[in-house]
Amino acid sequence: MTSSLFRLVCGPAVLTNAPAGWATEMLRDGEVAIVPDAEGLASIHAVARALDATAVAVVRGEDDAAAQERTVMAHAGPLALIWVASGFSDDARAWAQKRAPMTLLIEADGDLPQDERRRVERFVSILSGQAA
């Protein structure tokens, strides 16, 4: 049984381009899985360093966008999900709506703007408050 309250699925830049300490603090009650970018292993190493972690989970790559979304949805399991991607299909949006407050979808290319980081912080704060 996991003690995590949520899972974060995102590209490396969301974490490597965040302010110092933001990702580590935000992930205190969660876990991360990276969707690799064009930099591949180098960007995954950068995430591990940014998190001061010895290992980082990676979401399995798929042949097409629809299959990739299904993999992320399966990875979410019963936990709340923060999912950052450049866009979402109608199927992914419908899935997120069915999960209601358990899912936060954020459309962003590369790093996360400050206003979106605040949305993530509020979401995590709500989850932490419910778990207390």
PLM segments and residue spans:
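Alpha-helical substrate-recognition element adjacent to the catalytic core
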Residues: 1-67
